Amino acid sequence: MKKISLPKIGIRPVIDGRRMGVRESLEEQTMNMAKATAALITEKMRHACGAQVECVIADTCIAGMAESAACEEKFSSQNVGVTITVTPCWCYGSETIDMDPMRPKAIWGFNGTERPGAVYLAAALAAHSQKGIPAFSIYGHDVQDADDTSIPADVEEKLLRFARAGLAVASMKGKSYLSVGGVSMGIAGSIVDHNFFESWLGMKVQAVDMTELRRRIDQKIYDEAELEMALAWADKNFRYGEDQNASQYKRNEAQNRAVLKESLLMAMCIRDMMQGNKTLADKGLVEESLGYNAIAAGFQGQRHWTDQYPNGDTAEALLNSSFDWNGVREPFVVATENDSLNGVAMLFGHQLTGTAQIFADVRTYWSPEAVERVTGQALSGLAEHGIIHLINSGSAALDGACKQRDSEGKPTMKPHWEISQQEADACLAATEWCPAIHEYFRGGGYSSRFLTEGGVPFTMTRVNIIKGLGPVLQIAEGWSVELPKAMHDQLDARTNSTWPTTWFAPRLTGKGPFTDVYSVMANWGANHGVLTIGHVGADFITLAAMLRIPVCMHNVEEAKIYRPSAWAAHGMDIEGQDYRACQNYGPLYKR
């Protein structure tokens, strides 16, 4: 089957159409803006899969309806999913704008004095607002000379932020969320909302019973040679942790081997269900070889599977990581307990950064007073105001140990195309695989156990659905924290020390939900959250605006907030603007 092509970014150079001197004097400068924009994006961006982003420039500058239509025809034939219109001069507003209502769009009006690029920008944005097709405004802070072909830093930041978020929108459109199973233990996020996926994300939901996973394992609907490779890889790389089960629940060596084999098979089969596997077609299993075109998935597990079969912890953790027995590769997005809304937050984070995501319970707020009472030691540094314990038995990516290193040698989580095999091995070496606790998981399994290094910047996010309002997004930028070993051991032992831990300290503002760490925990909208590497809350805000998802909680500096220009017409309070604009325009793919 032909592989679906990646979305491209279309660059639209627009120009004053008056011939006999005006247009001719602007052709080169206008087209150079388009070429510079394309070069910037091509150099500095990649798709989440690691492929270079392609830009498509209109064949000619656009002065009116005819050239605009010719540009649209070219873009339609080349899978353009995002557009950036550029100009250094006055042009004819509504005659030259991109009118596709579902395609993210921005306009860069050159800040120069010779020609009124700012005037076109304002006129075009007014047309967008009047027609109900929001667009992002890009206008440099400082005046440039007409022959200056450089892109100022503030313009570059907006171009790249818009492009990252726009490509995320385009990449999700037409894909599916694979729901393996149904509702897990009454968790609301696993009550998968088809309307949300269809209307806000442009995605479908593929619902598959967990018996399909059972069938694939039992009937050997997988690559048997790959299974042997996966087992050999696990034998080489897995370190096993303490078995905390009572003696009557401990498994013997043969039973543990069977659990490991099934856990790896679950990873293989869920992957094949998501993206397909041509090896299955070679076995005559053509239907199964196609997969479900899934860009994200969730596995119910508890309790209808886990009371009898090995849990999904190993499968989920490996799929969400940037490496496995096939080497370093793009992480998948698989939500434990089929929490589709946390899965969407994971999907957003992966699409924006290309990195693996940490899925976790937002489990416990530890106040400085409580920590000192329990451990006899005081919190300090980033942790001085308290910490949140992020921990879950399931799908935290092994990258979350933060054994990868940035250019300064600091711990981080890299995009998969930057990860070396040595860094992947270091993450594996920092992970123990602990037998699942029988009281929770009667069918057994292995949970990954690691501790995230401290001082790493993270952004915690979550999507929630509110009846009568729709989806909302929560964002909390902060840092991982490294506690003294004795303190960590005492606190960790009070929950489940066989699971991966990240100690998280959000950045406080002294206001609202970020008054203190307790308020962050108290205002979090669900039991799960996602950690994405870096302080990238501004990118999430831009993406949410494109999808018409209001942000109900964030601690991003106001200067970094970048939304369509029409948001400013929805009141004077910046967050109220967001709610009113999202309500006014409705979901991007409204039905």
From Swiss-Prot:
<keyword id="KW-0963">Cytoplasm</keyword>
<dbReference type="InterPro" id="IPR012888">
    <property type="entry name" value="Fucose_iso_N1"/>
</dbReference>
<feature type="binding site">
    <location>
        <position position="528"/>
    </location>
    <ligand>
        <name>Mn(2+)</name>
    </ligand>
</feature>
<dbReference type="InterPro" id="IPR015888">
    <property type="entry name" value="Fuc_isomerase_C"/>
</dbReference>
<feature type="active site" description="Proton acceptor">
    <location>
        <position position="337"/>
    </location>
</feature>
<dbReference type="GO" id="GO:0019571">
    <property type="term" value="P:D-arabinose catabolic process"/>
</dbReference>
<dbReference type="InterPro" id="IPR009015">
    <property type="entry name" value="Fucose_isomerase_N/cen_sf"/>
</dbReference>
<keyword id="KW-0464">Manganese</keyword>
<feature type="active site" description="Proton acceptor">
    <location>
        <position position="361"/>
    </location>
</feature>
<dbReference type="Pfam" id="PF02952">
    <property type="entry name" value="Fucose_iso_C"/>
</dbReference>
<dbReference type="Pfam" id="PF07881">
    <property type="entry name" value="Fucose_iso_N1"/>
</dbReference>
<comment type="function">
    <text>Converts the aldose L-fucose into the corresponding ketose L-fuculose.</text>
</comment>
<dbReference type="GO" id="GO:0008790">
    <property type="term" value="F:arabinose isomerase activity"/>
</dbReference>
<dbReference type="InterPro" id="IPR038392">
    <property type="entry name" value="Fucose_isomerase_dom2_sf"/>
</dbReference>
<dbReference type="InterPro" id="IPR004216">
    <property type="entry name" value="Fuc/Ara_isomerase_C"/>
</dbReference>
<keyword id="KW-0119">Carbohydrate metabolism</keyword>
<dbReference type="Pfam" id="PF07882">
    <property type="entry name" value="Fucose_iso_N2"/>
</dbReference>
<comment type="pathway">
    <text>Carbohydrate degradation; L-fucose degradation; L-lactaldehyde and glycerone phosphate from L-fucose: step 1/3.</text>
</comment>
<dbReference type="GO" id="GO:0030145">
    <property type="term" value="F:manganese ion binding"/>
</dbReference>
<dbReference type="GO" id="GO:0005737">
    <property type="term" value="C:cytoplasm"/>
</dbReference>
<feature type="binding site">
    <location>
        <position position="361"/>
    </location>
    <ligand>
        <name>Mn(2+)</name>
    </ligand>
</feature>
<feature type="binding site">
    <location>
        <position position="337"/>
    </location>
    <ligand>
        <name>Mn(2+)</name>
    </ligand>
</feature>
<dbReference type="GO" id="GO:0008736">
    <property type="term" value="F:L-fucose isomerase activity"/>
</dbReference>
<keyword id="KW-0479">Metal-binding</keyword>
<dbReference type="InterPro" id="IPR012889">
    <property type="entry name" value="Fucose_isomerase_N2"/>
</dbReference>
<dbReference type="InterPro" id="IPR038393">
    <property type="entry name" value="Fuc_iso_dom3_sf"/>
</dbReference>
<keyword id="KW-0294">Fucose metabolism</keyword>
<comment type="subunit">
    <text>Homohexamer.</text>
</comment>
<keyword id="KW-0413">Isomerase</keyword>
<comment type="similarity">
    <text>Belongs to the L-fucose isomerase family.</text>
</comment>
<dbReference type="GO" id="GO:0042355">
    <property type="term" value="P:L-fucose catabolic process"/>
</dbReference>
<dbReference type="InterPro" id="IPR005763">
    <property type="entry name" value="Fucose_isomerase"/>
</dbReference>
<dbReference type="InterPro" id="IPR038391">
    <property type="entry name" value="Fucose_iso_dom1_sf"/>
</dbReference>
<protein>
    <recommendedName>
        <fullName>L-fucose isomerase</fullName>
        <ecNumber>5.3.1.25</ecNumber>
    </recommendedName>
</protein>
